[in-house]
């Protein structure tokens, strides 16, 4: 991330670096997955293979937003809350960080600072590492929540262009790929011959 910041600031001296909320929450999801794997390995090591097996099937329930959970996934989360407090705290840390980006201005900054304090005191090594990473990039995160910026639209266009590139595999020239991209993403709507 540092290389892109240096390049952007060299080209645009007055630019404000804003970090994408999706990627910040992805960091928290990765930290949560580290905790999940640690707990899973610990349960297997101490001989609780039944709980370990049940925990292994909970990955997607931990990753998803709470409002998108199925009944079965909600039951898995309830089981985690009852049987494994450290993993559930890691899940709550991830969800509270996600909630920071649903607010704007001073409220979001206050929520981020509260989250940083909680993560620092959590005694969960993966989230303490995440605390240091987010503290390092705090200015970019605050700029993002203050301005309400996201890379979501750019990411979706890039994904669509990669799909069109795969579709265009076998075209004789790159001009045909460019024409396909312009037709699909560029808003160009030529009149077709023989149609009114």
Predicted regions and their residues:
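Short, surface-exposed amphipathic charged segments that create phosphate/polyanion-binding patches used
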Residues: 29-40
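Acidic/histidine-rich catalytic cores and adjacent linkers
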Residues: 1-16, 22-29, 45-196
């Amino acid at each position: 991330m540092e290389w892109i910041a240096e390049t952007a600031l060299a080209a645009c001296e007055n630019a404000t670096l804003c970090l994408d909320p999706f990627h910040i929450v992805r960091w928290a999801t990765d930290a949560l997955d580290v905790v999940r794997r640690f707990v899973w390995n610990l349960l297997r090591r101490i001989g609780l293979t039944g709980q370990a097996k049940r925990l292994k099937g909970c990955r997607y329930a931990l990753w998803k937003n709470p409002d998108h959970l199925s009944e079965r996934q909600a039951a898995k989360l309830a089981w985690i809350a009852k049987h494994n407090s450290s993993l559930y705290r890691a899940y709550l840390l991830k969800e509270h960080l996600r909630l920071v980006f649903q607010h704007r201005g001073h409220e979001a900054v206050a929520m981020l600072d509260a989250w940083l304090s909680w993560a620092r005191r959590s005694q969960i090594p993966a989230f303490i590492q995440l605390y240091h990473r987010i503290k390092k990039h705090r200015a970019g995160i605050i700029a993002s929540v203050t301005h309400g910026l996201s890379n979501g639209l750019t990411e979706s266009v890039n994904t669509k262009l990669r799909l069109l590139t795969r579709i265009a595999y076998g075209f004789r020239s790159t001009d045909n790929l460019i024409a396909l991209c312009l037709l699909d993403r560029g808003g160009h709507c030529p009149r077709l011959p023989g149609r009114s």
